[in-house]
């Protein structure tokens, strides 16, 4: 699948 940016809590 297409690459994605994993959402990480700051």
UniProtKB/Swiss-Prot annotation:
What keywords appear on the UniProt entry? Bradykinin receptor impairing toxin, G-protein coupled receptor impairing toxin, Secreted, Toxin, Vasoactive
One MF term in the entry's GO annotations: toxin activity
Report, as the record phrases it, the tissue specificity of this protein: Expressed by the venom gland.
Q: Which pairs of Cys residues are joined through disulfide bonds in the record?
A: none
Q: Which GO terms describe its biological process?
A: blood vessel diameter maintenance
Q: Name one GO cellular component term.
A: extracellular region
Q: Does the keyword Repeat apply?
A: no
Enumerate the subcellular locations listed in this protein's record, separating them with semicolons: Secreted
What's this protein's function?
Helokinestatin antagonizes the vasodilatory actions of bradykinin at the B2 bradykinin receptor (BDKRB2) in a dose-dependent manner.
What name is this protein filed under?
Helokinestatin-1
Q: What is the lineage of its organism?
A: Eukaryota, Metazoa, Chordata, Craniata, Vertebrata
């Amino acid at each position: 699948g297409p690459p994605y940016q994993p959402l990480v809590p700051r």
